[in-house]
Design a protein with these regions (language model features):
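Hydrophobic h-region of N-terminal signal peptides that target proteins for export
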Residues: 8-18
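Catalytic glycan-binding domains that act on GlcNAc-containing polysaccharides
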Residues: 19-170
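Sec-dependent signal peptide recognition
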Residues: 1-8
């Protein structure tokens, strides 16, 4: 069902072809909104993860080998069907699928899900939110702060999603 919704929503994006070639930033924002909706996540959360992970740089590569907008590790990309970690849509789809999976795995605990996104689910399943790791706690706090800030701008984001899906309201 989610896949059909994504296909439908992406066909409704009026500037999809132009966006792919001419307006990469707009295409990235549209993909984030569409996949957030398809996976039942707040678009502001997806945007916050992208902002913190890569600063919206599709070619970002970490010193640990994570790549693309949502900084997917090779094994995570493979597990979630991402063929090209530098492809905007492929990376966002895989990253949002992974984030949604983590939120379910940690029974809605966003802090644990974000810690797992940063450090891997095995470590978080073993230790929880390891308060002795300033890097992990700092990451969770940073994404949470950006998420809260973006939620104050939510009405504008909802208008974008609604214009793409042909719905009204918020």
């Amino acid at each position: 069902m989610a896949k059909a919704l994504v296909v439908l929503l992406l066909t409704l994006v009026p500037a999809a072809h132009a966006a792919r070639s001419g307006d990469e930033g707009r295409w990235s924002v549209q993909c984030a909104a569409v996949y957030a909706s398809a996976y039942g996540l707040p678009v502001e959360l997806v945007d916050a993860v992208i902002q913190v992970e890569s600063g919206w740089n599709r070619y970002a590569v970490s010193n640990k080998g994570a790549a693309g907008l949502m900084q997917l590790m090779p094994a995570t990309a493979l597990r979630f069907g991402v063929r090209d970690r530098f492809d905007v849509e492929d990376n966002i789809r895989g990253g949002v699928a992974y984030l949604a999976w983590l939120i379910r795995l940690f029974q809605g605990d966003l802090r644990l899900a974000l810690a797992a996104y940063n450090a891997g689910e095995s470590l978080v399943l073993l230790r929880g939110l390891d308060l002795s790791s300033p890097e992990i706690v700092g990451y969770v706090d940073h994404v949470t702060q950006v998420y809260r800030a973006l939620r104050t701008q939510a009405p504008r984001k909802r208008e974008l999603v609604n214009s793409m899906s042909g719905t009204r309201g918020g």
